[in-house]
A protein has these predicted regions:
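Short, hydrophobic/amphipathic alpha-helical patches that form generic packing surfaces
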Residues: 43-54, 79-86
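Short, isolated positions in well-ordered beta-strands
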Residues: 14-16
Length: 109
C-alpha cells in the first residue's frame, strides 16, 4: 500500500493523496498514466494539482504551481503520486470484509 506524501511549505502542512473520488476528478480531465511520460508538460502538473484535492480541495492553482517549482526530487514525487493514483483503481476489486449479508452472484447460461 502506498503512503500519502506529506510536506510543509511556509509553515503549512500538506498531504497529497488520492481516493476514488479524486481519481475520478483527475480522469475527467483526461488524465492517463501513460500521458505523464508522453506529455509531461500537461500531465505532470495535472497529477500534482489533483493530488491536493483529497485534503486541500480549495487550494489555489498558483500556490500549487509555486510549491511544485520549489519541490525537490520531482521524478520520485511524481512516481509516488502515480502509485497513489493507481492504488485507487485496485480498491475497486477488493473483496468485502466480514459478512455482507451473504451476498452472492452467479452467471446463468
Amino acid at each position: 500500500m502506498a503512503n500519502a506524501v506529506t510536506f510543509t511549505y511556509k509553515n503549512v502542512n500538506y498531504t497529497l493523496d488520492f481516493d476514488r473520488n479524486t481519481a475520478v476528478l483527475l480522469e475527467q480531465q483526461g488524465f492517463s498514466v501513460e500521458n505523464v511520460y508522453t506529455k509531461p508538460n500537461t500531465y505532470v502538473p495535472m497529477i500534482f494539482y489533483y493530488a491536493f484535492a483529497k485534503y486541500h480541495k480549495h487550494i489555489k492553482r498558483n500556490l500549487v504551481d509555486e510549491i511544485f517549482e520549489k519541490m525537490p526530487k520531482k521524478m520520485e514525487l511524481i512516481k509516488a503520486l502515480v502509485d497513489l493514483y493507481l492504488e485507487t483503481g485496485n480498491t475497486l476489486f477488493d473483496e468485502p470484509t466480514g459478512d455482507e449479508g451473504n451476498l452472492t452472484w452467479e452467471q446463468n447460461g
